Amino acid sequence: MSSHVVSLTEELVTPILEEKNLELVDIEYVKEGKNWFLRVYIDKEGGIDIMECGEVSELLSEKLDESDPITEAYFLEVSSPGVERPLKKKEDFDASIGKNIFVKLYEPIDGSKEYEGTLQSFDGETVTMEYKVKTRKKQVEIPYSKIAKARIAVTF
């Protein structure tokens, strides 16, 4: 059910976002406690504001009401992915070269399943990161297929 809701929501929201020159970052349909949430994360170059989120929310809500794909009650949330934006697509990695990222792996590489460091390069199949171990800089090459989750990492 969850994947059906996500794919249908993607079909409904994509034309809205294209018209407004916005990017779909992610869609989640999750149950938290006794409530269901349909979360749509959108963005654009330079960031998105609350007015744009509100406009997309209203338009998407109308489309969802028309097609009525969700049987249970739910809350629709449209928002920015935040500063620690998830990296979901290969294009996200391309756009994040030179940025600090956090990567969680399905299986360890060099004894670790988590890396945080600077994304040096991405060739479509391999992520190359530079990270620190104490004061030494090291480099790791991670096959894209082994990445479970990745996101921008903010450092202070």
Curated annotation (Swiss-Prot):
It holds the Pfam family DUF150_C. Keywords: Cytoplasm, Ribosome biogenesis. It is found in: Cytoplasm. One of its GO terms (cellular component) is cytosol. It comes from the Bacteria. InterPro entries: Ribosome_maturation_RimP (IPR003728), RimP_C (IPR028998), RimP_C_sf (IPR036847), RimP_N (IPR028989), RimP_N_sf (IPR035956). Belongs to the RimP family. Required for maturation of 30S ribosomal subunits. NCBIfam families: PRK00092.1-2. This is Ribosome maturation factor RimP. It comes from Oceanobacillus iheyensis (strain DSM 14371 / CIP 107618 / JCM 11309 / KCTC 3954 / HTE831). The gene is rimP.
